[in-house]
Amino acid sequence: MLLCGLGLGGYLAWELYGTDVVAGRAQDDLRERVVQAWADGEEAEPEVVLVRIPRFGPDWEKPVLTGLDDTVLARSIGRDPDNAGPGEVGNLVLAGHRVTHGSPFRRFLDLRAGDLVEVETRDAVHTYRLREDGRRTRVDFSASWPLQPVPEPGAGRERPSEALLTLITCSEIFHTDDRSVVTGVLVETHPKTS
């Protein structure tokens, strides 16, 4: 019984803290490699971009990988490859964990309407303004509208007319089938100088 309790405690400690340490270091390393590659005028890992959310702190910057599967989300924030890219008309969808695997969206519920989100590529910085608070929209994990080209309930496959952003994470700190969602709209694009 004691061994079972110790084993369970060790597993929970690993899930809650160990994966944060390992993934956090890997995210920092990847971010540094991306910044260096761009400074050298090269591409970093294919389709890696950086995201900054000032509400999460002045130094908060995370790499965004392509894909939304468990392997990608265990490494960092993921981007839906079936939707728009940064700065493009359509829906740029980013998802990440609130707990474990670096906890990139730990403070998601602190987001406020009007907050800015910067998405940096090798060539430009795209700034989106959030339309709602992080606590406002909670959906079942099976809801598909946040992944649609126009992220609104009932919009279906409506054609987008503007560059949009959707951020998605778990609604609760511990396991839940609900997701918290915020959307934003592109307000600025600044090309980077060589």
Model-predicted regions and their roles:
Residues 3-194:
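Solvent-exposed, non-transmembrane regions of membrane-associated and secreted proteins
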